[in-house]
Every structure is written in structure tokens, then in C-alpha cells.
Amino acid sequence: MHHAIEYHHFSCQGLQAGNRKRTPVGQLLRITRGAALLRLGQHELLLQAGSSFWLCADALAAFSPLSGCEYDQLNVSLRLDQPQQAGWLEATPLLDALLDSQARWQRPQEWQGAYGQRLQVILDELQQCAISQQGYHDLQTRWQALASGQPESLQQWAQQADAPVEGLALQQQWQLLQALRLLKGGSKPAQVASKLGYANEAALQAACQQWGVSGDDGQ
């Protein structure tokens, strides 16, 4: 990190298969459009637009934005006071407004100027926010049913009035994400295709193209 606090905004044109790793900084992940998957410990959480999640430093996690996802990422150096547990962060209206303004920032991004001062205020506000281990219970229950392939889970997902992503799109990207993880682990494409229900290697490659996965991720 160049500075003690860094802000980034990302727009994902395709599925991004995040690597499972420990990061030596605290991270705030705030979804502003679409949805993302966060693998934390033994859990695979669905983060939807409007939700924020705090990852404490050195938490073992894999963050995988789905196609069309937009999100803010705030990195906080261990030199600074910050929350010590991971969980759903209940962002205050002020924190949301400050992060929205950072995404639209047009002036020079100078740490010693207004930009850096704004980041300091964001960190101060972040530390006032409550963090919960449980969040969006109904959504997570429906997501887990879909992820495990339970009967009628797709229909139940469609019954949500405010689903963050269309059910079939979520199901297909989850299937592909599992495939990409196996490929990164050294499994052969033919084995992966067979294990995850693809007709053949060509079908797996077609899924990569459909969801905008780069050649490097799809190997």
C-alpha cells in the first residue's frame, strides 16, 4: 500500500474468480450494483447491492464478483485502528454518502489534500458502524439452497421481490466458479466438465465465454 487508507471502485464485465488468500490489510467491500460471492472459512456468502462486509486483516477469504457487479474496496493498513472481527457492516447514511462521493471524485487524489482528509473521515465513520456475524438471513438461506441444488430452489429464488441477480444466471456462474477453482487446483478440463455436469470441455469453454471469464482464469 502506498498510503494507510486506499479507496478503489471496480466494475466487472464478467465473472471474476477470486483466489483464496490472506490479505495483510483490513478491507471494506461495499457492493453498489449486482452481486458477489465471498468465501470465508467454510461459508460461501452472497453479497448483494446495498450490502457492506468488513474483512479483518489476515482473514482467509476469496472474493468473487459476479458479472456486472460494481463495488467499492477500502483497504486499511494495520497501522490504523480498525474493526478486529469480520462480518456484515451496517453502514451509516454518512458512510454511504462519503463512499459515493469518492467514486465520483474528479479532483487530484492527494493524500495530503482533501482526498486524504475524506478518507480519514471515512475511516472514523467506519469505526462507528456495527458489525454482525449474521446478515440477510432469508437471502442467504435461498442462496444456499440454490448453491446446493435443492429441488425447487430456482423457483423459490424467483419468488423474491428484490433478488439481486436472476436465479439461472447465479446458478450458472456458481457452477462455473466451482469449475474455475478446480482448474486452478490442477484438475484437467475433461474431469472438471464431467464432475460439474457440463456436456464436454467445449461446453465448459462456452460457459467461460458466456460469463466473460478470461483465458487465464479458464485454464
Predicted regions and their residues:
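…primarily DNA-binding HTH/wHTH and HhH modules…
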Residues: A202-Q219
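Short acidic-glycine-tyrosine-enriched beta hairpin
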Residues: G41-A57
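Short alpha-helical "recognition helix" segments of helix-turn-helix
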Residues: P189-L196
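Histidine-centered metal-chelating micro-motifs
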Residues: G18, F53, D58-A62
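Generic protein-terminus/edge-of-domain signal
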Residues: M1-A35
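Ligand-binding loop in jelly-roll beta-barrel domains
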Residues: A59-A91
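An amphipathic alpha-helical interaction segment
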Residues: A91-Q160
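Short, Lys/Arg-enriched anionic-surface-contact patches
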Residues: Q160-Q175
